[in-house]
Amino acid sequence: RTWCRFGRRIPYLFIGSAVAVAVMCLLPNAGSLGMAVSTAMVFGLVSLMFLDTSINMAMQPFKMLVGDMVNERQKSFAYSIQSFLCNSGSLAGYVFPFLFTACGIANEAPKGVVPDSVIFSFYIGAIILILCVLYTTLTVKEWNPKEYAEYNERKPEADEKKAGWITLLRNAPSTFWKVGLVQFFCWAAFMYMWTYTNGTIADTVWHTSDVASKAYQEAGNWVGVLFFWQALGSVVWAVVLPRIKNERWAYAISLLIGAVGFAMVPFIHNENLLVLPYVLIGCAWAAMLAMPFAFVTNALEGYGHKGAYLGLFNGTICLPQIVAAACGGTLLAMVGSHQYNMMLVAAALLALGALSVSLINKNKPQNLTIQQ
């Protein structure tokens, strides 16, 4: 129903990116628009909501393009390329504020105002997004419905039959659910990393839990450096992943490496040595961005409603984080209220994710239609 002369996925990519660019230009200026504090906070929250929605609107179609146009044998490689490029973008995002500061652009600002180095980073990110989307839009030629049906060896009308999300889930291939289980453990683990890394590093390296202290702020600054190294590890590992012939082994090994990284964090008391575990964590992150979609899109061959299924699969990213956030306080109390122990919880979750990979079967494409 969404096929038009501009393609099936490209319009979503273009519109979602356009909204994201607009928000990226407005968001860092929230404190400079003369609004009251409460109004500025609401503006920021609404802007983040639009940014998150628009980025999802843009990212899902380019993942679907791989599922639409890349054969089964090369999908893992294609998703690894996407993982490499995504993490390269993250790397650039971490570098730009430091680079602008080194060039003499102010890294400090009055209370309630974002520093120029951060504002310019947002602008550069918006420009890069525009250029990348324009390149994709102008160079990728999507198939028309007939070509798509011929390539995927199914009838053109297979995607036209209406089906509710409950019906789709009931008819989903088993791989959809098995990869979803792996996703649950992985995204819960990373939710705890994002939530508790700052407090962990402040406690184990700077020996403080006072969020108002200078030491805590220094720890927060160093977390940004560690996330840079995580992104760098992801970029490098995304190049290695396609060279591992067995996809399940590649996925499981990556998650186990990440689990080792999480487990190391509480026991390292030197900020420079913390680079190693975060590089290892980056290996798991690279696999999480590439492997799940390769398994699921291969399993969905012949099912139809691929876009709807990938949209539903996005729930395996959101729901684990919601559950992890809801349970985080209880778990923290259970592990002695020490934030660094949550990194061990994250390690255990990632290890469970690695073990769950063994449940995934390599499905052969099928010619199926949705049963109402």
Model-predicted segments: where are they?
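C-terminal ends and interior cores of transmembrane alpha-helices
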Residues: 13-38, 257-269
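Intracellular juxtamembrane helix-capping segments at the cytosolic ends
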Residues: 57-70, 287-302
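Helix-to-loop junctions at the C-terminal end of transmembrane segments
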Residues: 1-7, 235-248, 332
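Loop-to-transmembrane helix entry
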Residues: 80, 116-117, 207-231, 312, ...
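C-terminal transmembrane helical hairpin of 12-TM major facilitator-type secondary transporters
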Residues: 248-292
